[in-house]
Amino acid sequence: MYTRNVQKKTINFDSFAVKAKRDNTKYLDDSPASQIVKELEPTERDLVVDKSYASAFFGTPLISYLIKLGVDTLIVVGGSSSGCVRATAVDAVTRNFNVAVVEDCTYDRIELSHKAALLDLWMKYCDVVKSDEVSEYFASLKQSSH
């Protein structure tokens, strides 16, 4: 499942852009900045959730999709660690999901913000793991399903 930041032409939901008096049209639906990079491009079977706020849960149908699919655990990656990743992880925990944030698959504009966000998430909300731990987890799921 993927999320992407998409803004509407008529409304600027990004309060930071408003505060900084920035034009936020780079995140319109058809702009390159709102697209998922080719190397990680979703397949036809993948769900893509468009969001306008930091949390992937706020104002989106994400919770409905997860419940319908019987999901109990979320593995969160992406950016920014102190913004979208943190907001999504915290919201997922408040909805009773098990959550892991993948340390080496998340990023932030400033390394200090990245480290502080991961520390805060680990101390209060969820597991912070490395990508090799996630690979081992998926391998164990495959083995147990055979």
Question: Model regions: which residues?
Answer:
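Von Willebrand factor
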Residues: 1-10
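Active-site-adjacent betaalpha module
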Residues: 7-8, 17-146
